[in-house]
Swiss-Prot record:
This is 4-diphosphocytidyl-2-C-methyl-D-erythritol kinase. The lineage of its organism: Bacteria, Pseudomonadati, Pseudomonadota, Alphaproteobacteria, Rickettsiales. It catalyses: 4-CDP-2-C-methyl-D-erythritol + ATP = 4-CDP-2-C-methyl-D-erythritol 2-phosphate + ADP + H(+). ATP binds at L93, V94, S95, A96, G97, L98, A99, G100, G101, S102, A103. The gene is ispE. Belongs to the GHMP kinase family. IspE subfamily. Its EC number is 2.7.1.148. Keywords: ATP-binding, Isoprene biosynthesis, Kinase, Nucleotide-binding, Transferase. GO terms for molecular function: 4-(cytidine 5'-diphospho)-2-C-methyl-D-erythritol kinase activity; ATP binding.
Length: 282
């Protein structure tokens, strides 16, 4: 039996624009992804006695989850059929706009794909079958994604403020599918693909002036998001404050570590009803 321990980092959408809808009702998105040092941990046992995916601190089905779906897809393209069991230690908030399930699936795809020498293009195709955020999570680097998550542009030279605090209302969660199903706006955001910035300052201006198109829908289900964003935007030295993904997690981004730490310390003292993480962009 072989045992592997792998990390799955959380993602944050610095902006998220909805630019249209396909006939199958999937939405076209354009989003700037970053990944932060808040991780789920996956203990992967290969050729052991057990099969399935086990979550140490959440009640999630061991067969009906993104990690198990990814394993089943990978096994169809492998010459071996080992027993695989995974114990997932969840640190990323569930149903919170941080792509925890997608990150976990991407982590197992990376591990088994490399182990079984599966082609990188095929891995990306399989990742998209698991979920629209999984191809981006497979990269786990700063990137711009468009379409339904399949079209990715890596941005290795983009220098961003690195220090971030994540804030979510305690005990609240939001289903991604629920939020998208209630997104009824037909006045979609204009695509920015033909005018993506080249210069660093232009990227910073784009990020600052962008938004999350899912915010209004999320507010209908978790109105506490509005107060969180109001407080975050008032923090000293904050660059931007915004909701990530389909919510309900929000973030505040800072240039200096001390500014982020002071802000998080203040929030922990004054808002015990919020879950707060200090993090750094990878």
């Amino acid at each position: 039996m072989s045992i592997f321990l792998v990390k799955a980092p959380a993602k944050v959408n610095l902006f998220l624009h909805i630019t249209g809808k396909r006939i199958d009702q999937h939405h076209y998105l354009e989003s700037l992804f970053v990944f932060v040092n808040v991780y789920d941990l996956l203990e992967v046992n290969i050729d052991g006695r057990k099969r399935g995916v086990y979550f140490s601190n959440f009640k999630i089905s061991k067969y009906n989850n993104t990690v198990y779906k990814a394993i089943e897809l990978l096994l169809k393209h492998s010459s071996v059929r080992p027993n695989i069991s995974v114990n997932v230690i969840k640190n990323i908030l569930v149903s919170a706009g941080l792509a925890g399930g997608s990150a976990d699936a991407a982590a197992i795809i990376r591990l088994l794909g490399n182990m079984w020498n599966i082609d990188c293009k095929l891995l990306q195709d399989l990742a998209l079958k698991v979920g629209s955020d999984v191809p981006a999570c497979l990269e786990s680097k700063t990137l711009f994604a468009k379409g339904v998550g399949e079209d990715i542009l890596l941005l290795p030279d983009l220098l961003l403020p690195r220090y971030i605090i994540l804030v979510a209302p305690r005990g609240k969660s939001l289903s991604t599918a629920k939020v998208f199903n209630h997104y009824k706006c037909d006045n979609f955001s204009a695509s920015i693909c033909d005018k993506l910035p080249v210069k660093q300052d232009d990227w910073m201006e784009l990020i600052y002036n962008s938004k999350n198109d899912l915010l209004d829908v999320a507010l209908n289900f978790v109105p506490e998001i509005e107060e969180i964003l109001f407080v975050l935007k008032k923090l000293k030295n904050v660059f931007i404050a915004r909701m990530t993904g389909s919510g309900a997690t929000c973030f505040a981004l800072f240039h200096e570590l001390s500014h982020a730490e002071n802000a998080a310390k203040h929030l922990r003292m004054t808002r015990p009803d919020w879950v707060i993480f200090n993090a750094k962009i990878l």
